[in-house]
Amino acid sequence: MPITKQRTLDYMQQEWGTYVERFKCLPKEEQEKRVKRQGYESFQDMLAHILAWWEEGMGIIHAIAEGREFERKKYDFDIFNAEAVAKYKPWDEAEFMDHFEKTRQQMEADLRSMNEALFENRRVRSWLNGIVFEHAREHLVTLSRFLTLDMLVHEWSEYADRFQRLDSEKQREFLLKQGLDSFHDLLAHIIGWWEEGARIIMGILGSPGFTWIDPDVDQFNLMLTKKFASWSDDDLLKHFDVVRIALIEMVDELPDDAFMNKDIEGWLAADVVQHFDEHPIRT
């Protein structure tokens, strides 16, 4: 996955910098529902978890940047997360939100001041991937245009290449975990859901009365496998990229209020963000 200084700064500014504001725009009932879905009692508890990992990761990144030794810990994630929530539980909400934002701004400033070469360090990249990039997807409570486009432009553009870089044994292991016979079938599955999501989103935008029936997942997936079975691998890969680019253009042109539509947001979040983590290729 391409982790660069500029992309990291973009995440800190455009994704995390709007994170709280976007959440606050949701109706109160929807806020509570989405926080509970994340497994937290309150939004502040979830932010405390995010904040604690920022602080932990940046401590290590600073040490690497300065050539200092740092403790290599084996984390018990349940304990670490519980301690983070407990630490900030007594804080007044306004005081905590101010602290969260100041920490975000300082983190962005610190990363901006660091040498570009630091972002090539394996441990730095690993921490940034966890606390900046993966955390944005893991704790997705409101979808942004930025995150949607970033996933399509960066992560999905490298998806097939990432699979090809695996050795044959790792490829077999990955497909076995996915319950699929071939990477061809996986691409067919992804393409089909992208196309279905785009069809529904354009229908919603085109007509207030637009309706659709959610497909039976198993039957739809089987249909997609059959639909693209006769396609060559090369043709399917080209079509994958055509559909990906079409999605980029569609998302780029969506009106701002489209992301406040629960159905549009839901389809984009499922197809572009969650789908990526449902079929993760680790290299």
What are these regions (language model features)?
Residues E32-I79, E116-S157, R172-Q219, E253-T283:
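Short, contiguous alpha-helical
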Residues C25, H49, S113, R165, ...:
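Conserved catalytic core of Hanks-type protein kinase domains
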Residues N81-A117, Q219-D257:
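Acidic/histidine-rich alpha-helical segments that form the ligand environment
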Residues M1-T18, S144-D161:
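Extreme N-terminal tail/first-helix region
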Residues W16, L26-E30, W156-F174:
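N-terminal first-folded block
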Residues M12, W16-Y19, G57, F100, ...:
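Hydrophobic alpha-helical core bundles mediating ligand binding, dimerization, or RNAP-core interactions
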